[in-house]
């Protein structure tokens, strides 16, 4: 755990070397240092780091030695895009470690760029990602890679380029079909340039309650697209008493969501710049995207507890909304309602509580990443 404790402290360690990270240049260097370290850790990990890492290596070796056809004869059925990616890499590189290098560089670059472009507190956002997302990225690497493609496509939403967004999502689904859930988000660019608070609230609520009402249809679609997931929905369920659906976390996510909506549109009304939260102050497309992810996080614990443990995979997507929204809500609330001394206390309490929580998450080792080892060991 000492190794991962240092990883959790990286946002604070690198912060010591900068007098300020509000400056765009310092912010870029700061985030580059953090995510370069995360890239190295993720890409050089050994076969025992991550529950699915060994299976990724086996798939690579099978396709490298016998071609894609041999993989299907072996009775498996991964997405074509993923298999083609492996085939191309295996024609150039013999060692399967290159697959993790590619996964890591794309995943960490996408997250680094997202935090740089849309977060008003890069230190807190980086810490939240390391706490909630980094360990997962060394296990669900294929899904993280597909979602990274989605994150890199956010500019298409900003520019209201409907066709490019649809093509991007369809491309990502050839790596992991779960990214198909982002196809309906293509309607966001159809919003007015100056959307208001009520409109955004309606969109987020429709997305939230629509996901509940259409749950059965969604499950049937998933089973149709990926038959091997049948057992997850009809053969494996959590009980309603699990901590995954605790009222505390659901209420906390809801509070973050609605505070973010409220504070963002207060900024709009007073014509105050929302730091680097969005590229253009009055373009609501990126903020609605992250609000929808946060809304998805609100409903995710319910799905995990009462439908299927498979919905834990939704967290790969939805928690990115929290990386952006939590720092935004805390910073804006502190600036608006608290004195300087009170702000310091709030930040200290936040980092202490979430630091303990982060240590607990890693200690539980739900992704099989402890102990860490390099691939040459």
Where is each model-derived feature located?
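Transmembrane alpha-helices of multi-pass, membrane-embedded glycan-processing enzymes
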Residues: 86-90, 99-110, 149, 322
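Short hydrophobic/aromatic helix or loop-helix immediately within or flanking a transmembrane segment
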Residues: 54-62, 71-94
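Membrane-interface alpha helices of multi-pass inner-membrane proteins
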Residues: 133, 164-187
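Transmembrane-helix signature of polytopic, membrane-embedded enzymes
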Residues: 25, 112-131
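Alpha-helical transmembrane segments and terminal signal-anchor/GPI-anchor hydrophobic tails
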Residues: 54-57, 64, 69, 83, ...
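Transmembrane helical bundles and short interhelical boundary loops of multi-pass, membrane-embedded
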Residues: 293, 343-377
């Amino acid at each position: 755990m000492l190794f991962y404790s240092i990883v959790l402290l990286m946002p604070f360690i690198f912060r010591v070397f900068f007098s300020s990270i509000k400056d765009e240049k310092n912010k870029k260097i700061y985030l580059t240092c953090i995510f370069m370290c995360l890239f190295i850790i993720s890409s050089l990990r050994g076969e025992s780091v991550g529950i699915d890492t060994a299976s990724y290596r086996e798939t690579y070796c099978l396709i490298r030695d016998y071609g894609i056809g041999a993989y299907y004869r072996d009775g498996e059925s991964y997405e074509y895009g993923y298999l083609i990616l492996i085939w191309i890499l295996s024609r150039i590189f013999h060692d399967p470690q290159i697959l993790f290098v590619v996964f890591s560089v794309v995943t960490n670059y996408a997250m680094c760029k997202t935090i740089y472009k849309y977060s008003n507190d890069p230190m807190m956002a980086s810490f939240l990602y390391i706490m909630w997302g980094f360990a997962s990225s060394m296990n669900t690497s294929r899904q993280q890679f597909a979602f990274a493609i989605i994150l890199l496509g956010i500019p298409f939403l900003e520019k209201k380029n409907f066709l490019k967004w649809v093509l991007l999502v369809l491309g990502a689904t050839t790596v992991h079909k779960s990214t198909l859930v982002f196809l309906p988000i293509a309607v966001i660019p159809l919003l007015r340039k100056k959307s208001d608070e009520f409109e955004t609230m309606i969109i987020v609520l429709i997305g939230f309650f629509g996901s509940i009402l259409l749950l059965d249809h969604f499950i049937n679609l998933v089973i149709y697209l990926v038959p091997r997931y049948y057992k997850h929905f009809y053969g494996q369920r959590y009980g309603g008493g699990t901590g995954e659906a605790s009222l505390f976390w659901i209420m906390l996510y809801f509070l973050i969501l609605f505070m973010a909506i409220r504070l963002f549109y207060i900024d709009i009304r007073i014509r105050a710049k929302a730091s680097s939260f969005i590229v253009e102050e009055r373009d609501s497309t990126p903020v609605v995207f992250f609000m929808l992810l946060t809304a998805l996080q609100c409903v995710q614990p319910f799905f995990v507890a009462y439908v299927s443990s498979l919905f834990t995979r939704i967290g790969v997507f939805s928690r990115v909304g929290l990386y952006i929204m939590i720092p935004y809500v805390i910073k804006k609330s502190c600036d608006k309602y608290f004195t300087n001394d009170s702000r310091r206390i709030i930040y200290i309490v936040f980092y202490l509580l979430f630091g303990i929580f982060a240590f607990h998450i890693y200690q539980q080792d739900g992704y099989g990443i402890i102990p860490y080892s390099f691939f040459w060991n």
